[in-house]
């Protein structure tokens, strides 16, 4: 098709806006898969000719019919144009069956929608009858034998990596256009927008990018679940919502994270925020899921497009083990801030967020923490009530030198370190059960971190009383090292009369199965080996610049408990029992060792050796 120089400027401008809005989120992923001469550079001018991932539907005419001479089946034609730079390619879409057609009619009601299609087939349109708007077309079985026209989806929204096959899309379309001597094609979708019609396995992305002018904001939920038995719960929930509501009310976006589709799946239920009935229905069907972690909000696709998301923790302790999906957000009454996310993948987003969140009025933060007091109590394991926020600050720090990190840089300016973490400095006024107001410094952390504190009821009371007398400073750091995402917890105080100066915990491994362990103990009584182990740990600490976080046996001198932090792994010993177990189902606490006598010394080298063996086994399984 000839290039149209007089392309409608408004449409071009719309596409450019959409592209600019999504550019920051996808440029790194696209660059990794494009040929070297087409890689994006951070300061590149936007070249519209590089847009290979948007289908632009300029016009839809559902009154135009297709007819199959063999079956006499009639299908509506959805006319559209694919915009590639300044080149405009016309095409048509037909549905494979009436159910899909109804979904498409609802989907194409709104103008200027950009939609990414998957696993589509190109048809040659034959013998177009201009009088009665009827077009004959071949069956897909006949066509496949004569034309190589299988195409794959262009982009996976979650990983932002273009599939290799998609790079040939334009050349394929152009080649077909030249060979057919026609500007029109039919794209047949193999599944509908309805989630139940999506093909198995769940390795496709269904993603819709909306113009801000069309929809001011959307609401929805995100269901996060690992592939396995719990996916059935998600499917049942989706089916319930669909069976009991108008199907055109909800848009379904199902995302398989990254290239390892067995790792993690996100299911988005998106609906118009003005549709109160849809909101109520969704809330009704979410009631059975009692373990809702946090209510979330994400401004991701456009400035005016909001997806309100809920993360679900199931009783089995499902937790994503991919650092790229640790994007937890907290939202309440318009107050939004990140609880945890991958800085390296979201540098620009991080920069904007830190600027905006640090400008939030303290009254809003105070209201947030006050209303979410239950959450804080359950996480912190003591009974306090936030009364007022006196100070709030979120910033990036270097994990090595602890100095503030310049957003956008890959290395720390001060020490050239490569790991950064987000810190939340929130000074609050808390109120205990006796209504004694005391000042406390609390660095927020989520329920995962709380699991590191194996606090009994009696200890909880002791900690509770302690808070009424002294200031307690608790700080949680998250780093984003790919192999060892360490969580460093620092206590600058004595909690329930125990010195906890520094300790280090982490969850770098995939879930460990119980059967890997057995009840036979490897009891190390050699004093020389014990000394060698402690020396190894000390050297490890110095080599890894962890002077502030001494890596050694950290003992809790309470009753019969001892907790050890070795090589970034949380290990608990309990002398009241006699078998060694792996703590499940909480994935972040990887290994629990239980021994019969308190005077037994466990070798750190042995622990590290077992952990490394487990890592090898896990890598082999993956």
Swiss-Prot record:
Its main location: nucleus. This is Telomerase-associated protein of 75 kDa. Keywords: Chromosome, Telomere. Disruption phenotype: Telomere shortening without affecting the accumulation of TER or TERT. The keyword Ribosomal protein does not apply. GO terms for cellular component: chromosome, telomeric region; telomerase holoenzyme complex. Component of the telomerase holoenzyme complex, composed of the catalytic core (the catalytic subunit TERT, the telomerase RNA template component TER and TAP65/p65), which is associated with two heterotrimeric subcomplexes: (i) the replication protein A (RPA)-related subcomplex, composed of TEB1, RPA2/TEB2 and RPA3/TEB3 and (ii) the CST-like subcomplex, composed of TAP75/p75, TAP45/p45 and TAP19/p19. TEB1 and the CST-like subcomplex are tethered to the catalytic core by TAP50/p50. The gene is TAP75. It is found in: Chromosome, Telomere. Component of a CST-like subcomplex of the holoenzyme telomerase ribonucleoprotein complex, which stimulates telomerase complementary-strand synthesis. Telomerase is an essential ribonucleoprotein enzyme that copies new telomeric repeats onto chromosome ends by repetitively synthesizing the short telomere-repeat sequence 5'-TTGGGG-3' using an RNA template component TER. The CST-like subcomplex (also named 7-4-1) binds telomeric single-stranded DNA and coordinates telomere G-strand and C-strand synthesis.
């Amino acid at each position: 098709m000839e290039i149209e120089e007089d392309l409608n400027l408004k449409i071009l401008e719309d596409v450019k806006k959409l592209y600019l809005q999504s550019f920051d989120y996808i440029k790194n992923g696209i660059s990794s898969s494009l040929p070297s001469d087409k890689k994006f550079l951070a300061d590149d001018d936007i070249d519209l000719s590089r847009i290979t991932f948007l289908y632009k539907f300029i016009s839809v005419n559902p009154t135009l019919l297709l007819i199959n001479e063999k079956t006499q089946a009639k299908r509506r034609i959805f006319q559209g144009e694919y915009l590639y730079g300044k080149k405009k390619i016309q095409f048509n879409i037909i549905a494979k069956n009436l159910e899909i057609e109804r979904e498409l009619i609802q989907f194409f009601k709104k103008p200027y929608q950009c939609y990414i299609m998957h696993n589509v087939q190109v048809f040659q349109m034959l013998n177009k009858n201009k009088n009665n708007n009827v077009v004959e077309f071949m069956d897909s079985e006949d066509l496949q034998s004569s034309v190589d026209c299988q195409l794959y989806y262009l982009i996976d929204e979650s990983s932002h990596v273009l599939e290799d096959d998609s790079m040939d899309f334009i050349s394929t379309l152009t080649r077909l256009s030249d060979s057919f001597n026609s500007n029109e094609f039919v794209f047949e979708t193999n599944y509908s927008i309805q989630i139940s019609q999506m093909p198995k396995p769940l390795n496709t992305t269904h993603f819709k990018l909306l113009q801000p002018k069309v929809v001011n904001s959307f609401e929805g939920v995100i269901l996060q679940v690992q592939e396995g038995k719990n996916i059935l719960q998600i499917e049942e929930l989706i089916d319930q919502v669909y069976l009991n509501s108008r199907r055109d009310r909800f848009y379904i976006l199902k995302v398989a994270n990254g290239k390892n589709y067995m790792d993690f799946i996100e299911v988005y239920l998106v609906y118009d925020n003005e549709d109160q009935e849809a909101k109520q229905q969704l809330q009704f069907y979410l009631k059975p899921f009692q373990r809702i972690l946090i209510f979330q909000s994400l401004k991701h696709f456009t400035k005016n497009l909001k997806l309100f998301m809920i993360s679900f923790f199931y009783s089995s302790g499902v937790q994503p083990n991919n650092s790229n999906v640790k994007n937890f957000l907290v939202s309440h009454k318009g107050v939004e801030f990140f609880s945890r996310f991958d800085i390296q993948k979201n540098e620009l987003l991080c920069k904007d967020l830190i600027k905006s969140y640090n400008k939030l009025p303290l009254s809003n933060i105070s209201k947030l923490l006050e209303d979410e007091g239950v959450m804080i109590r359950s996480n912190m394991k003591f009974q306090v009530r936030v009364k007022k926020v006196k100070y709030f600050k979120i910033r990036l720090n270097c994990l090595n030198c602890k100095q503030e990190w310049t957003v956008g840089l890959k290395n720390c300016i001060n020490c050239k370190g490569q790991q950064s973490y987000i810190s939340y400095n929130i000074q609050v006024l808390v109120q205990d059960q006796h209504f004694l107001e005391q000042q406390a410094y609390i660095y927020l952390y989520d329920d995962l971190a709380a699991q590191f504190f194996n606090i009994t009821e009696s200890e909880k009371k002791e900690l509770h009383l302690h808070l009424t007398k002294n200031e307690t400073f608790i700080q949680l750091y998250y780093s984003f090292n790919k192999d060892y995402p360490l969580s460093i917890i620092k206590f600058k105080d004595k909690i329930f009369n125990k010195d906890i100066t520094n300790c280090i915990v982490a969850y770098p491994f995939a879930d460990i199965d119980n059967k890997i362990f057995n009840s036979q103990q490897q009891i190390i009584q050699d004093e020389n080996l014990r000394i060698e182990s402690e020396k190894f740990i000390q050297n490890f600490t110095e080599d890894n610049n962890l002077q502030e976080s001494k890596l050694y046996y950290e003992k809790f001198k309470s009753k019969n408990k001892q907790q050890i932090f070795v090589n970034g792994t949380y290990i608990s010993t309990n002398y009241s029992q006699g078998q060694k177990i792996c703590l499940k189902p909480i994935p972040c606490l990887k290994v629990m060792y239980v021994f019969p006598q308190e005077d037994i010394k466990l070798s750190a080298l042995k622990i590290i050796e077992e952990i490394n063996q487990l890592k090898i086994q896990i890598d082999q399984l993956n």
